Amino acid sequence: MRAVVLLSGGMDSLVTTAIAAHLGYELAALHINYGQRTEKRELVAFQKICDFYRIERRLEINFEHLSLIGGSSLTDLAMPVTTAKLHSKEIPTSYVAFRNANMLSVAVSWAEVIGANKIFIGAVDEDSSGYPDCRVNFFQAFNELIKHGTKPDTRIEIQTPVISLKKWEIVIKGMELEVPFEHSWSCYKSEHVACGVCDSCALRLRAFEQAGIRDPIEYKIRPSYI
């Protein structure tokens, strides 16, 4: 069994990678650079995680178009990365328009060429930033798209093993699978020491705190979000 895993280097994609490895898949790891502020640090995390799981087949793709399109504080340096508002129902400025569809398109192309029948992605729906392309119905629709846009004998299905989990449950799952959380990177602002106040840092810190486990990475400040 062969599978492509979309591996950003964050905690959700790390745990998803661990789940896929635990299921016995031969993994091919895909990493997308799209002009994000922490691009270099995320790539380091990707390589460390691949090394940990001994993933030999790796593909790094550069997406210039998402940063050229802009509209996100992750890719547009003129837009500030906002401080986390975890109870807000608004989609944060860190949303990159239709990012997952762009990434999944590459994953499907690669999967079809190398004969992988699964694509794993660490999307989280319920306990996350509220990005529209992380919803269950989005991935259901994309699976239908794959059926209609690939060769008749191609059988590729997207797997989202953590999509319905709370973030703290993802931490617990990761601990059960003995994942190297210290190799992962979630901060949207900094490539050196995690800021502790962006949306991604806040969600991560809250998850570890709710799980009763100290996050092993270093933070500039480490607020409580409970």
Swiss-Prot record:
One Pfam short name: QueC
Per the entry, which co-factors are needed?
A: Zn(2+)
- Sites binding Zn(2+) sit at C187, C195, C198, C201
Its Enzyme Commission number(s) read 6.3.4.20
Pathway, according to UniProt?
Purine metabolism; 7-cyano-7-deazaguanine biosynthesis
The record, for Gene3D superfamilies, names: HUPs (3.40.50.620)
Cited function: Catalyzes the ATP-dependent conversion of 7-carboxy-7-deazaguanine (CDG) to 7-cyano-7-deazaguanine (preQ(0)).
Protein name per UniProt: 7-cyano-7-deazaguanine synthase
